[in-house]
């Protein structure tokens, strides 16, 4: 399949001891074996911001790793009942500090203020995120 750009996503796998980190890494290696020149982007859960799990994924050398912040801090408990805003930022910060191109997504139109959106964008930038997508 001569793929040039591959985006891999999944649901959160809290049912697995490593949150799926080993599977993410193996998936990247398998794609590289079949398509060595393909750019690979992952969209991963926060893996509880555990450096050991994040480093497992990072070591597989995807080109971009994304983790979506999804919403502003105030709305996180409502929009992402099992997630924590600060844990997402720590996840992104760790990946960025390891030199990985880091991406996050933010939904708008959920009742957030302009100032809250700007604060979230500032928080993402402070965490080292270089790519942000906005959706509705």
Each predicted region: which residue ranges?
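Conserved AdoMet/S-adenosylmethionine-binding subsite of the radical SAM
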Residues: 1-6, 10-135
